[in-house]
Every structure is written in structure tokens, then in C-alpha cells.
């Protein structure tokens, strides 16, 4: 029985109402425990955190760290790997490449080095679930899970057309059990299927009809959201709206929020969906965050993560095939596209965000507007949609921008003049507190994901803890934690990996109507390239540990 205490730290634990109070944190067998009643009880180790900031471990609820498109991007970017830092093997760590799409081991070391202990890949094709789990075995130090793509799934659309919501619900339950996934993701609902069937097609709005299936994106969003709530999944439908990146797409985003009809919905990388303007004229590009944020503020069924853009080179990777092709045409560089049988697609294109570009500068500003205009920090999560808007390594820079309006003004002064007239960021004076930073990077994502054992330092929580050295340089504070603990063990000390542990795979196992299995099997064996018996992950295939997260009371 291993017992440890973090003594006299300045604790930020918003889930338990602790805002900068000096407290001791007791840990035993990987969990937070109450302080012993006997004052003479001695722990095996004492960490003196006097003068230091103590928070729960960070949670990235939307990133891309595994799966086929991540691996395709790794192969596409040898030039990026060559000019980026190489992580050399040590007695504890494996070697790896970095850059915008780091290798598996490097990804985990870099995340943990920032104080993050949990991460979710946001878009895994069900067919690729087995390989994603195998990649997770090479991603130590983190607990991890993934969201399963279903917004262009042909079985789902077939049953929506047939007005068989009970089969949609049963299929999603079966799919999550088969893949050991965590949540349901919809990417450009219906649009990817149109792209696959027409070659260069897409949908332009929520009421366009998807070829051959005679359903609309609105019906897909509504049907999936209802099924997710009926299955009582811990995380709501995770929505990548139609028309990502297009001028004027804010109206599509607003209609998507309305299409949920009161069901829970998480709108992801919302920055990319908040643009004013004419789709045929980029000169009209601007922000419509105030209108969208007002709607989110008044509808408690909605949460968002931002997808912040930061300047520099990165890589766009998405389950949105037509978007990948659009970026290729705009940027003129490398491009990769792939169709995933009856399930999904993807597109990849390297991109460099430039300060001198009005569009890129506005994207940077629009992301910050979302953080500053959503009234309740519990309903907005930090993300860069790694690596789409920027690497997750940019999080300390973003935190510094949110906590210091002078710093924001200094960056604005370096951007094209027109930025100031096409967004409201110059007028926003709000500055985040450390408590609010703890919410959007830890407690809030945990609540959105339904992870009751993470994101806080209360009794029974996982003992995932980050200890920071406070100072005037906020960016420096968050990019180099003093200590990072995972399940009560010190993994990182001043940026150096001291111990490697595997972490756990997080997934759900919802109940579903097994009477639907014959229908699923019949359709599957008529259309797929693999047999249905080879599709589900079997329990014995898991070489690492896994945690089944229970459903919600919603």
C-alpha cells in the first residue's frame, strides 16, 4: 500500500470549489484519499509543494494522435520530421520524431511534459479501431480513448431513410462495443458520402439530400444525437459541422445547433465553423462568433471546443474528404485522400498559418473570441484540433493569451489592419484566471466527457496531478511543469521523463437491443470486405489495461 502526500500546494480544483487555497493532497494506490484522521500517520513520500501551483492532470478531449490518417500524415511529412527535434532513446524512453505529427512515443512524452495525462483521438474509422488500439499500446504515460466515425455510415443512413430509429440506436451500441470506442462522431454529416459517390461532390447545407440514401444532414444529426442520448453515453454526439472553413458557414453551424432539437451536442473545433462572408469571395471573410456564442450561452445542451489556430507550419488532417481537397486546391501542396468503405473518408494537406494572411489572422482572432465570449468556462474546452489549428504544444501560448489582454493586443498589432474591423477581439478585455484555465483544460473536458474520476482532486479521483512553478511568464509556467504524476507516480520532473507507465484505454460498453444483430450481420456481410466475425475487438486482444466508463443519467 503506497501512500504519498503533496504538502502545502496552492490548489486549483474547480470541480470541488477549490480556487487557489493551500492544501495537502493525499494519494494512496493511485487514487486521491482523505487526509488520515491520525495526525501521526506517515506517508512513504512527501512532495513539498510550498509556493507551487497544483492542478489535476490535463485532458485533451479533441486531438488526432492515432489511426490511419495520422499515419498517412506521418508518411507524407519526412521534411517536417527532418527539421524538427528528434527524441533520442534513453534508459526509460523510446526514440521518436516530432514536428506537427509526432510519432506515437514522442506524442505521449510531449503531452505528459506539458502536464497532460489523458487524451482522446477524435476521429477513428470503425474498420481501423483495432490498429488504433495497437497504436495506443505505443502511446504510454496517457490514458486515452477515441471517438468512432458514424456521420456518413451507410447502415445508419439506410435506417434513417427507413425511419427505423431503434435500429440506428442498436447499431451504434453494437458499434461501440465492437470497436471499444468512447463516443460517436459525425464529420460533415452526409457530405463525405456525397464526396465518395460523386467524386467531387459535397453538401452545401443541412437540407441537401444525400445521393442514394435520400436523407439530409439535418436528419443525420438529429437521428444520431437522439440515439446517443437514448444509449445514455457519457459524451454527447461530437459534431464536426458541414461547410468547415467556408466563408459564411456560421449559418450552417447555427442550424446544426438547432437541428439537435434539445439533445446534447458537442460542437468541435468551433473556430473553423464561425465565419461570416460569401463562400465565393474570401475578401468578405470575417467573424460571427458573437451570434453563435450568444446561442451557446442560452442553450445548456451545447458544449464546444475551440480548435485554436496559431501561426506556423502544421498539417490539416480530417475525416472530411472534400475539405482536404479544397485545401489542396487553395494551397497547391501535397494532398492525400482516402475512402473508408461504408463508413467514412479522410483528407490530409500540410498548411502554414501566416501572420500576413488576413484569413489566417482572423482565424487566430476568432478562436480567442470563442474563449472570451462563452460566459461559462465549463462549456468551452481548450483545443487546437491537434494538429489542424496548431500542435498541442501551443497550449501554453494560448493560456498566456487568455490570461493577458496586453499580450493579445501586442499580437494584434502585428497582424493585417483589416483584422480589427472584421472581429470583436480588440474590444474584449476579459482575462482568464488560473481557476478558469483549470476548468477549460481539466475539469471542463472531464465533465463534458462524463469522466467522473478525472479532472479533479476530490476523494476517489485518479491521482493524476500536475505541479507548476508560478511566475510572471505564464507561457513558461505551463510549458515546463515542475512535476507530473500519473496514478500517484511521478512520471515527469522538470521536463524529464523519470518513469514510463502504459496508461489505460477508456471506452464504453452500452447496452443495446441484440435483436438487431441479424440485420446488422446481413448488411455487413453483403457490403464489407471483412467478415462480421472478424470485425469486433475481442477482450483477449487487449494487451494493456482498459477502463469501461459508465453511462450518464441523462
Where are these regions (language model features)?
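Active-site microenvironment of metallo-dependent hydrolases
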Residues: 1-41, 67, 74-75, 81-118, ...
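Active-site metal-binding motif and surrounding structural segment of the metallo-beta-lactamase
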Residues: 38-55
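Active-site neighborhood of phospho(di)ester-bond hydrolases with catalytic His/Asp-centered motifs
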Residues: 55-61, 121-122, 269, 305-307, ...
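Flexible loop/turn segments at secondary-structure boundaries
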Residues: 66, 127-129, 153-156, 191-195, ...
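Acidic, His- and aromatic-enriched active-site or binding-groove loops in soluble protein domains
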Residues: 143-151, 258-269, 406
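Histidine/acidic residue-rich metal-binding segments in metalloenzymes
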Residues: 164-188, 192-380
Amino acid at each position: 500500500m503506497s501512500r504519498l502526500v503533496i504538502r502545502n500546494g496552492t490548489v486549483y480544483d474547480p470541480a470541488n470549489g477549490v480556487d487557489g487555497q493551500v492544501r495537502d493532497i493525499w494519494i494512496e494506490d493511485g487514487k486521491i484519499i482523505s487526509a488520515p484522521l491520525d495526525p501521526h500517520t506517515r506517508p512513504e513520500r512527501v512532495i513539498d509543494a510550498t509556493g507551487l501551483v497544483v492542478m489535476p492532470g490535463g485532458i485533451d478531449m479533441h486531438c488526432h494522435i492515432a489511426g490511419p490518417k495520422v499515419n498517412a500524415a506521418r508518411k507524407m511529412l519526412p521534411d517536417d520530421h527532418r527539421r524538427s527535434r528528434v527524441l533520442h532513446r534513453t534508459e526509460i524512453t523510446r526514440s521518436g520524431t516530432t514536428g506537427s505529427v509526432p510519432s506515437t512515443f514522442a506524442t505521449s512524452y510531449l503531452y505528459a511534459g506539458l502536464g497532460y495525462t489523458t487524451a482522446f483521438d477524435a476521429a477513428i474509422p470503425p474498420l481501423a479501431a483495432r490498429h488504433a488500439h495497437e497504436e495506443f499500446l505505443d502511446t504510454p504515460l496517457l490514458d486515452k480513448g477515441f471517438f468512432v466515425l458514424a456521420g456518413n455510415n451507410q447502415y445508419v443512413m439506410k435506417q434513417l431513410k427507413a425511419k427505423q430509429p431503434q435500429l440506428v440506436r442498436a447499431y451504434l451500441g453494437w458499434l461501440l462495443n465492437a470497436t471499444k470506442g468512447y463516443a460517436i462522431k459525425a464529420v460533415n454529416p452526409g457530405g463525405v458520402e456525397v464526396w465518395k459517390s460523386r467524386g467531387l461532390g459535397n453538401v452545401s447545407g443541412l437540407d441537401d439530400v444525400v445521393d442514394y440514401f435520400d436523407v439530409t444532414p439535418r436528419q443525420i444529426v438529429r437521428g444520431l444525437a437522439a440515439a446517443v442520448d437514448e444509449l445514455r453515453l457519457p459524451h454527447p454526439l461530437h459534431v464536426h459541422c458541414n461547410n468547415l472553413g467556408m466563408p459564411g458557414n456560421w449559418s450552417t453551424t447555427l442550424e446544426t445547433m438547432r437541428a439537435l432539437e434539445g439533445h446534447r451536442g458537442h460542437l468541435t473545433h468551433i473556430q473553423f465553423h464561425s465565419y461570416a462572408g460569401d463562400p465565393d469571395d474570401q475578401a468578405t471573410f470575417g467573424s460571427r462568433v458573437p451570434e453563435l456564442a450568444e446561442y451557446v450561452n442560452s442553450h445548456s445542451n451545447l458544449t464546444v471546443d475551440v480548435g485554436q489556430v496559431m501561426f506556423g507550419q502544421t498539417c490539416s488532417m480530417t475525416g472530411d474528404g472534400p475539405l482536404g481537397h479544397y485545401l489542396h486546391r487553395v494551397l497547391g501542396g501535397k494532398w492525400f485522400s482516402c475512402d473508408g468503405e461504408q463508413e467514412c473518408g479522410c483528407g490530409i494537406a500540410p498548411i502554414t498559418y501566416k501572420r500576413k494572411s488576413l484569413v489566417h489572422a482572423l482565424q487566430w482572432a476568432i478562436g480567442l473570441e470563442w474563449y472570451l465570449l462563452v460566459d461559462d468556462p465549463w462549456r468551452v474546452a481548450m483545443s487546437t484540433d491537434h494538429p489542424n489549428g496548431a500542435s498541442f504544444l501551443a497550449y501554453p501560448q494560448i493560456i498566456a493569451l487568455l490570461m493577458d489582454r496586453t499580450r493579445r493586443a501586442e499580437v494584434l498589432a502585428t497582424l493585417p489592419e483589416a483584422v480589427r474591423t472584421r472581429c470583436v477581439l480588440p474590444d474584449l478585455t476579459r482575462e482568464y484566471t488560473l481557476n478558469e484555465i483549470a476548468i477549460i483544460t481539466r475539469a471542463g473536458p472531464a465533465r463534458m466527457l462524463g469522466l467522473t474520476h478525472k479532472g479533479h482532486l476530490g476523494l476517489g479521483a485518479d491521482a493524476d496531478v500536475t505541479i507548476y512553478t508560478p511566475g510572471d511568464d505564464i507561457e513558461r509556467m505551463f510549458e515546463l511543469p515542475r512535476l507530473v504524476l500519473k496514478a500517484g507516480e511521478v512520471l515527469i520532473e522538470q521536463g524529464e521523463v523519470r518513469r514510463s507507465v502504459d496508461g489505460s484505454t477508456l471506452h464504453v460498453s452500452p447496452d443495446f437491443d441484440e435483436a438487431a444483430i441479424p440485420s446488422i450481420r446481413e448488411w455487413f456481410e453483403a457490403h464489407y470486405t471483412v467478415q462480421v466475425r472478424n470485425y469486433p475487438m475481442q477482450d483477449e486482444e487487449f494487451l494493456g489495461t482498459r477502463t469501461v466508463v459508465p453511462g450518464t443519467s441523462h
